[in-house]
């Protein structure tokens, strides 16, 4: 007869057969997860299956919506290093490109990704620093089958163990000239005061083989000319 308290409350040591089988199953699941969503996997599958978002107004948390246009945008991001996308708030486009840049940094060593907005932001709820906070949110809400990945986070900065970084920058040519990036996400470009100068300063990113993605609500000026290929 089992002793009182035996069974459900028993703690198995790491060498117990049940614990070893559980560890082996977890390792197998992690390998499958990385094969499907990791460096050699599909970034759209990662967004569709693994990414949760948070509405910055209501605080509602939900899975990223699986719209056909979102997959198309990810495919365009994979194919074209220079991308300009008009958006509406309901399209959740900024979250989409935060997610694919997170995927790039998480699974590709020594990637340097920049999130740029009109202002850097003094807190993690403002400007481009808020975009980095979204990447941290995605990181914290991945499925449990992903291997543990300890990141370094501060306002406007996210660093991965593989040497990759996501950094927040405000608009401006001086900010852009200081670095060459693997990928840049430029958000709400229609409302930047120095959009053209920043764009020119980011040319080395494209010429060096990096990606530059500009997204914005519709508006006149530089972004409209960029979308319609009328910069001259």
Q: What function would you assign to each model-found segment?
A:
Residues 2-232:
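Phosphate/NTP-binding elements of NTP-utilizing enzymes
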């Amino acid at each position: 007869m089992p002793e009182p308290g035996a069974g459900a409350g028993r703690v198995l040591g790491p060498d117990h057969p049940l614990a070893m089988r559980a560890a082996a199953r977890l390792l197998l699941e992690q390998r499958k997860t990385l094969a499907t969503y990791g460096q050699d996997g599909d970034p759209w599958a990662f967004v569709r299956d693994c990414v949760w978002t948070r509405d910055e107004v209501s605080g509602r948390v939900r899975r990223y919506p699986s719209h056909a246009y979102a997959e198309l945008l990810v495919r365009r991001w994979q194919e074209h290093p220079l991308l300009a996308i008009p958006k509406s708030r309901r399209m959740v486009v900024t979250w989409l490109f935060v997610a694919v840049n997170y995927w790039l940094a998480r699974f590709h060593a020594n990637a340097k990704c920049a999130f740029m907005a009109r202002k850097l932001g003094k807190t993690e709820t403002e400007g481009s620093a808020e975009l980095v906070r979204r990447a941290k949110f995605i990181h914290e809400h991945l499925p449990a089958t992903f291997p543990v990945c300890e990141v370094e986070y501060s306002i406007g900065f996210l660093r991965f163990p593989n040497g990759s970084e996501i950094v927040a920058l405000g608009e401006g040519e001086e900010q852009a000239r200081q670095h060459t990036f693997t990928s840049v996400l430029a958000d709400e470009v229609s409302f930047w005061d120095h959009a053209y100068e920043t764009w020119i300063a980011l040319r080395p990113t494209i010429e060096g083989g990096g990606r530059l993605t500009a997204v914005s609500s519709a508006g006149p000026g530089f972004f409209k000319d960029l979308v319609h290929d009328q910069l001259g």
